[in-house]
Amino acid sequence: MSKKNKKFFRNDDATFAWQNGYINNNKINSNKPSIYDHISLDQSSGKNFLSKSLIPNYNFEDIYDTDKYSNKNKNKNENNIINKKTNNKYNNENENINYTNEIPSINRELNSIITSTVGLSNLGNTCFMNTCLQNLIHSEDFIKRLLTKKSSISRATPISYYFFNLCKELANSTRAVSPNKLKEKFGQKHLLFAGYGQNDTQEFCRVLLEDMNNELNEVKKKKPYVELKTSGKSKIQCDKEFDENFRGRESSIVMDSFYGQIINIFTCKCGFKDYSFQKVLDLPLLLQTSDMVSIDDLLEEYFEEEEIKFETKCEKCGKKRVHKKEVKFSQPPNILILSLQRINNRTKRKNTCYVTFPEILDINKFIDVDCGHAKETQYILYGIGNHSGTINFGHYYAYVKLNDKYWYEFNDSMVRRISGGINTRSNTAYTLFYKKRI
């Protein structure tokens, strides 16, 4: 990556956005604080790792509604479009979810959901939501886990309840489904998403998964937080202790599918190493160039070793020194979400540089083998969230690969098969969904 272009999106810009961004329906940035207070930033560097983090959303005004351009006035076979309209079979709010008698096999039920080619109605600038939902609903590992826990889903877990209802509607409908119930409940809980203003698909995805993670948390009696002591312990022991301590407070199918574990390695000049760990839901990858860049380049930059700018006291030599910091996966996730940070919230500019991404992603060099997870780790691309246009006039849509074979475009209510596959060199790719290769 050319150094002369790194000023395009500086790391301190990202820090400013994460710390100060607050979006309403009319402004991109204001001085109001974020509605979430659990952002965890490591400000020892420009890398700004996020633990269970949220990045502010960015409003896109005047979004066109693809429902206005549906096929009802066109030839039904034109351009391989699958035109769907709303089916209310599962909209009865007075019934708890119980599909035991409907589909006897989880695998059959799973297949009917993840192979669905049914669109979602645009309720008015809700393409950001539909794009995220289609990628999540076609996430095999997650949906399979969800089906095994469906007995625990009820009105007491409203976000999970309406998400699962939506999955079932898509699996059993031949017409586009309205996500209005999920949208309504989500907006009641998060005022930022109330109404029909446009929002950011990455933030919506994080908040949605956070909600379901909290609702489906299987820990009834949480253990008190215990600070991890790493002195004299091996990496594998520290990694295990952190994970067990964390899961003593939070453990859910969302965590099992989407969360990875990061190890931060701090090295003193005397050679002493100290460790810290954190759970991550996705990897926010900064675009610091206007030139074409590869996902491998962005991951190299995310995980590169760096020097901490402030001095800390070494536990071994007792001296206050600048430490070096290295970051790797100690436990890679089953589903890896890569969030391309195309929008600079500070300058209100969108980076439209081309990004190349492989359909098979190898991340072995970003895994710490000393943590006991040294298996060869490759990921298969199965979902893409795209954003076309500008900040003030743009649109979200999804690409999803079905049966590991054919790619489909999910553009709100419109769904079509992409002949010849997708282009893995794109200036619209915004979020990439990879599943671990088994």
Locations of the language-model features?
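Exposed substrate/partner-binding surface patches
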Residues: 5-7, 19-21, 37-42, 46-48, ...
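USP/UBP deubiquitinase core
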Residues: 96-232, 335-340, 417-426, 433-437
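N-terminal intrinsically disordered, low-complexity regulatory segments of eukaryotic proteins
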Residues: 1-32, 36
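Cys/His-enriched microdomains
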Residues: 264-266, 312
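Asparagine/serine/threonine-enriched low-complexity, disordered tracts
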Residues: 20, 26-31, 67-101
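Intrinsically disordered, low-complexity regulatory segments in eukaryotic proteins
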Residues: 228-247
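Short, recurring structural edge motifs at helix starts
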Residues: 253-256
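Residue-level signal for mature regions of secreted extracellular proteins and peptides
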Residues: 120, 261, 307-310
